[in-house]
Amino acid sequence: MYPVDLHVHTIASTHAYSTLQDYIAEAKQKGIKLIAITDHGPDMVDSPHEYYFINMRIWPRIINGIGVLRGIEANIKNINGDIDYTNKFTKLDLVIAGFHETVFPPQDVKTHTTAMIATMAQGQVHIISHPGNPNYPVDISAIATAAARYQVALELNNSSFTHSRVGSEPNCRAIVAAVRDANGWLSLGSDSHISWSLGNFHHCQRILQEESFPIDRILNVSPQRVLSFLQQKNKCIIPEFNNF
């Protein structure tokens, strides 16, 4: 089991079903130490208002012994790599970004690859969400090389093997192998939209084992590894986690 989940949605994304408190209780029960709340960016049709992200500053850093990162799953908007993460949100700890049909309709490999690399190059994003989505094929080798260059983790998303983005597994396998060969970072995300799936990386673990991916390049191994990654990426130091 990994003690960190870096992709979680609450009822603020209205197609999800659990509250922050629900996730804290579930994390406590499962022995998860650190979670990132990453509700959908404001360009999604049922996303929270921008005030929701701004007001995350009132959240305690540690709740009942569980560390909470303030995050967003932003939307890649165009081929220039722009995302719906504005200067108003700059106090967030973790920025995930990915393609979603209602914001960036699927196009072709070249367009998707160019947009994803441009997003990474802008320097705001820590993790690219579900890059194995078959609706958005990319040049996997180029994406993995760029991710390593820009210190961006590529996500292995457990829900891509179950009910979302059907047909993702071949791409996800290729991404894991490409990140391994590029000496990049992988992030595991449950992409939970209900608390019961928090920390469920069952399918991710199977792929990691079968592709012989090194554990020292997986962010979720410990809270300390995630916090160190954030600090190295953009000098994000969270004093409340100094002794966490």
Curated annotation (Swiss-Prot):
Its name, as the record gives it, is Probable phosphatase BCI_0316
Q: Which Gene3D superfamilies match?
A: Metal-dependent hydrolases
Q: Which HAMAP family match?
A: YcdX_phosphat
**Per its UniProt record, what SUPFAM superfamilies does this chain match?**
PHP domain-like (SSF89550)
Q: Where does Zn(2+) 2 bind?
A: 15, 40, 193
According to the record, cofactor stoichiometry and binding are noted as: Binds 3 Zn(2+) ions per subunit.
> What CDD domains does this protein map onto?
PHP_HisPPase_Ycdx_like
What's the short name of a Pfam family annotated to this entry?
Answer: PHP
Q: Which GO terms describe its biological process?
A: bacterial-type flagellum-dependent swarming motility
* Cofactor(s) required, per the database record: Zn(2+)
One GO cellular component term noted in the UniProt record for this chain: cytosol
InterPro entries in the cross-refs: Phosphatase_YcdX_put, PHP_dom, PHP_phosphatase, Pol/His_phosphatase_N, Pol/histidinol_Pase-like
Q: Membrane spanning segments where?
A: none
Family according to the record? Belongs to the PHP family.
Higher taxonomy: Bacteria, Pseudomonadati, Pseudomonadota, Gammaproteobacteria, Candidatus Palibaumannia
Gene Ontology MF terms in the entry: phosphatase activity; zinc ion binding
Asked if Zinc is a keyword of the record, the answer is yes
Q: Where does Zn(2+) 3 bind?
A: 73, 100, 130
Task: Provide this UniProt record's keywords sorted from A to Z.
Answer: Hydrolase, Metal-binding, Zinc
- Which residues are involved in binding Zn(2+) 1? 7, 9, 73, 191
The protein's Enzyme Commission number: 3.1.3.-
